[in-house]
Design a protein with these regions (language model features):
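Short, conserved beta-turn/loop elements at beta-strand boundaries and strand-helix junctions
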Residues: 17, 109-120, 219
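Arg/Lys-rich, positively charged N-terminal/basic patches that mediate binding to nucleic acids
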Residues: 1-45, 51-53, 141-185, 194, ...
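Residue-level recognition of beta-strand microenvironments
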Residues: 15, 110-113, 125, 136, ...
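Flexible glycine-rich active-site/ligand-binding loops centered on an Asp-His dyad
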Residues: 120-154
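Short coil-to-beta-strand transition motifs
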Residues: 2-8, 95-105, 208
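Active-site-adjacent substructure of cysteine-protease-like catalytic cores
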Residues: 47-101, 195-199
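Basic/aromatic recognition patch in beta-strand/loop cores that engages polyanionic ligands
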Residues: 198-218
């Protein structure tokens, strides 16, 4: 049997310091930014020659925080509420034999004049900060876009976005406008697990240097941000 050992060519840096809050798919939060910083041996501008002719990229990456000890053929997709099982190869579950992820992101710019350059700036990411990147390829609309494709069970169990409200105290934080909009769009996707919809519970989500604390009302379809704490001396998760 042919086997191949692969190594990361780059590391993705994002505002997602923990798994909770990461969009379930790439592109759901267009404002979620990331920077691809190459490993030293791959920091050659020639490797990116022509990449700026494209608007989107495919990123092949690894679920570095998941440790799959043995093959599990059935998984419980979040979209099915954690109650129904599907075959692992019929889902995008992170619990996979080789732990590989695939994301389509927007190419915003390439920064060549940097000590760690070239750096690729992208948006619409769904990756944890520090995620290993194994390959990068251009997105080709004529080949990669399939308008008549079927979404399978995902079409019948779509996620409904929720309305995000800010308390006055939370609005007084030092969060800039761009970050505020990004946080709103992240929370509008309702990052809570399908089995954890407790009302009046204070959730904590980290994005960038901020700890965002919120409560949710599933019946009203709202999430209310109650406090924003800047993480100066490390991150202290709300429990």
């Amino acid at each position: 049997m042919y086997e191949k050992t692969i190594e990361p060519v780059a590391i993705m840096h994002t505002g997602f310091g923990e798994k909770f809050g990461i969009p379930r798919q790439s592109g759901l939060v267009p404002e979620a930014a990331g920077q691809i910083i190459f490993e030293p041996k791959y920091r050659n501008p020639d490797a990116l020659r022509g990449i700026e002719e494209f608007t989107h990229l495919w990123i092949i990456w690894g679920f570095s925080e998941n440790r799959v000890e043995k093959f599990t053929p059935l998984v419980t997709p979040p979209r099915l509420g954690g109650r129904e099982k599907r075959g692992v190869f019929a889902t995008r579950s992170p619990f996979r034999p080789n732990g590989m992820g695939l994301s389509s992101v927007r190419l915003d710019k390439v920064e060549y004049k940097s000590s760690k350059g070239p750096i690729i700036h992208v948006s619409g990411v769904d990756m944890l900060d520090g995620t290993p990147i194994y390959d990068i390829k251009p997105y080709l609309a004529y080949a990669d876009s399939h308008p008549k494709a079927s979404d399978g069970f995902a079409a019948e169990h779509r996620w409904d976005t929720v309305h995000v409200i800010w308390r006055d105290e939370a609005l007084k934080s030092c969060m800039d406008e761009d970050t505020r909009i990004t946080v709103e769009h992240i929370l509008a996707q309702d990052p809570r697990a399908a089995y954890n919809k407790a009302r009046d519970y204070i959730y904590g989500m980290r994005y960038g240097r901020f700890d965002i604390r919120f409560v949710a009302d599933s019946h009203a379809g709202t999430i209310e941000i109650v406090d924003v704490v800047e993480c100066v001396d490390g991150y202290h998760k709300v429990k």
